[in-house]
């Protein structure tokens, strides 16, 4: 009796080429996502918080002392915005502050530099200073500096949301 054995071809399982394809797809996806994220990050924010971190660290204690002195002076600032205007009112112990000559504001976006503005607000009496400026809608950071003569008497940083005219 002769039995003819039929040879079956071995089933092709998971081969090295399959592993190469899986690894290529995985790392290709990771690298592609990283490139897209890096491109978006480089277009939206410089990443610069301070120009020189060592110098900033040396100035930290002085800035803390200055902040405590401003707080002890009793001067408080309140920023309000409306379409086409920014209003900053300074008070000392609940009364309008009269000794301040000018207020300078640095208006900037939290994550971009190209829309930053440095402006001087115009006095309107009763401790109020106004800027007739149309800000684009969205989040802003206002670094306010109130001055009497050449001396800075109050400094405040305020985060706010400017609304557009259509709201």
Curated annotation (Swiss-Prot):
Keyword entries, A-Z: Cell membrane, Membrane, Nitrogen fixation, Plasmid, Transmembrane, Transmembrane helix
Transmembrane as UniProt keyword: yes
Transmembrane segments: 19-39
InterPro entries assigned: FixH, FixH_proteobacterial
GO BP terms in the entry: nitrogen fixation
Function description: The four proteins FixG, FixH, FixI, and FixS may participate in a membrane-bound complex coupling the FixI cation pump with a redox process catalyzed by FixG.
Name of the protein: Nitrogen fixation protein FixH
Organism: Rhizobium meliloti (strain 1021)
